[in-house]
Design a protein with these regions (language model features):
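Extended, charge-rich alpha-helical interface modules
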Residues: 1-71
């Protein structure tokens, strides 16, 4: 059960990282004025903050909770 929970949390965090990386790439490649995102720099900065947040959480998970039992 612990292994299943660990893998689920790890996948959740990595999925969020991938989502926000994709958002930055889309924003950078399609920098067209959109009503919801008029300030491209601010939008990308927010996405980078979310990437950093999820990467920090993933690092903590791997540092403190990854054991041989989980592998």
């Amino acid at each position: 059960m612990r292994s299943l929970l660990y893998k689920a949390i790890e996948s959740y965090l990595q999925g969020n990282i991938d989502k926000h990386v994709a958002n930055v790439k889309i924003q950078a490649e399609n920098a067209v004025g959109v009503a919801e995102h008029p300030d491209h720099i601010e939008t990308i900065d927010k996405e980078l903050g979310k990437i950093a947040e999820f990467e920090d959480r993933l690092e903590v998970l791997r540092k403190y909770f990854k054991t041989k039992e989980v592998l």
